[in-house]
Amino acid sequence: MVAATDFVTKLNAAIEAGQSVPDIISADTTKVLNYYPNIPCNDVTDLVDQIDEERPYLQASYEGTKIDDKYYYVPFYSSSTLMFVRKDKLEEAGITEMPTTWDEVFKDAEKVSDPDNDFYGLAIGCGENDDDDENTIRQYMWNEGGYLFDEDGNVAADDKVTAVFDKYAELYDDKVIPQDATTWDAGGNNGSYLAGRTAFCFNAPTLYNALVSDEQYKDLLDNTVVLAPPAGSDNSVYMNFNRGFAVMNTCKDTDLASDVISYLLDKDWYDSYMEEIAPVFAPVFEDAKENTTWKDNEVNAQALKYVENASGYYGYPVKTLKGRTVAAKHYFTYPFVKAVNQVATGTADSAGALKSMTSAIEDFQDQV
């Protein structure tokens, strides 16, 4: 076994040396694209299509894992980002229905904010490497019709993107967002929620597991509703977090590797396995919608709802292989969340932050 923190380093070393390369690896789109232009994974399109014919994939998982009309890994499961809501705080403010749009979330968050008592509506940070909240803000941007790239891979950020910067800064200035949120890392949002400081938090279902597994959070759990994220004025596209299995191009028996992956997708075994790891990961097949594990449990159902709508990806809606690669690789330099941070902290206005972000992405684009 290899620790997750060591996996990529050891895999890269094996690939470079041409020795001890695994036949099958756990993969996702970002991991695959980071090897462009020398992607070391086989094209497994035929296997994915065969699986889809026998047991149809959710459309978002089927389309969202395709790279330049090919599959470099077989989709297996997906994580999600769910909305955790303090229902007791909403009730105290006279709010009787859960919000379904971003505008409603922001309005409700403003109503429940009480900064004098260190309570805030939104747990959305913009620290320098806060990838969790960058994904949330990016998704909000998509939902409002804003994009960093066009389909051809050109940087296409416009006034819809600056509107997102300005909205975040407005919420921050109005103290709907904690004032330390500009320094958060990826754990800042869920940390604030667990500490009872925030009413709305967008996080993986691991936050739900933390609430369930620790007795100290019993009251917080009882007052928490877990939902799929809201829709925007333009769409309700979610970021996809599909993962699966890739066959390396050094594999000497690709037929056997395909058989192993097919075995792991055997319906009975797969369904029982997914039941054990719910709701942190959700299935990627259409028939999951009729499975009681994912239909009758409210939190599991919301996780599956997320996966059903998770057709977005880094760079969405770019279609080209190089464009997808630039988007996937630039993500790890965080120019987007840095721009949000600049506007929130007043070190740049939205136009200046947009210009700086665009320049950073274009410089990176030239290196790919």
Regions found by a protein language model. Give the residues of each.
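Extracytoplasmic/periplasmic solute-binding protein
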Residues: K70-F76, T81, D103-N154, T198
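C-terminal lobe and pocket-closing loops
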Residues: T206-L220, S233-P335, D366
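Extracytoplasmic "Venus flytrap"/periplasmic binding protein-like
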Residues: M1-Y57, E91-T100, S192, G196-F200, ...
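Short helix-loop capping/hinge motifs at secondary-structure junctions, enriched
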Residues: D88-M98, Y147, D174, T250-A257
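Beta->alpha turn/N-cap motifs
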Residues: A27-K31, A186, N203-L211
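Glycine-centered hinge/linker elements that transmit conformational signals in sensory
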Residues: D108-A109, D152-T182, V225, P229
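Hinge/lid segment of periplasmic solute-binding proteins
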Residues: D28-S80, F106, D132-T136, K160, ...
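Short glycine- and hydrophobic/aromatic-rich loop-to-beta-strand nucleating segment
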Residues: T81-V85, M141, F245-V247
